[in-house]
Amino acid sequence: MKGLIVYSSLSGNTKKIAEAIAEVAEDSELISVREFQSSMLANFDLFYIGYWVDKGDCDAATLRLLAQLKDKRIVLFGTLGAAEQTEYYDRVKQQVESHAVHSHILGHFLCQGAVGEAVIARYQSMLAVHPQDEHIKQQLANYENGKSHPDEQDLANARAFAKSIG
């Protein structure tokens, strides 16, 4: 089965996961979403689609890509700034999968990634205005803890996930 790994990455986190998957996904090619062309659809049997989370959903470039994947076998993977919170992760997965209802989803991997400094600065500004806001404090703590992600364990988990797909 010939696979195509297509990723969208704002800060490099999803690219790292895509590269880890590419190490173990046999007979697969790795490209950025910017390199993807619809003419490629006929050349592959399996599509690994990597995204970064933007406000609880996949990024816009991935949305456009998913709209083109009708009746395809796909594997989803993504990164987000939040620490592993099962309920939130599940909501994100459901939301992203809702854009691929016309495809056969074989699996979905999600892990924490480091957040850009601009996002952290925005939350710090919000905290200055609302110093008692526990949600903002928790977000900043998550972002601080996430600076090392995706880490070696995340990459190992991504490889194991890809191997489980076959």
Cite the ranges covered by each PLM segment.
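Alpha-helix C-terminal capping/helix-to-coil transition sites in glycosyltransferase folds
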Residues: 42-44
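A short, well-structured beta->alpha microelement
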Residues: 26-39
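The conserved SAM/SAH-binding core of class I Rossmann-like methyltransferase domains
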Residues: 6, 31, 77
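N-terminal beta1-alpha1 ligand-phosphate binding loop
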Residues: 2-24
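Flexible, glycine-rich phosphate/dinucleotide-binding loops
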Residues: 12, 37-39, 83, 117
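Short, Lys/Arg-enriched, disordered terminal segments
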Residues: 1-2, 166
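FMN-binding flavodoxin-like domain, especially the glycine-rich phosphate-binding loop
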Residues: 24-28, 46-49, 54-166
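Short, surface-exposed acidic/glycine-rich loop or hinge patches that mediate macromolecular interfaces
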Residues: 8-11, 35, 52-56
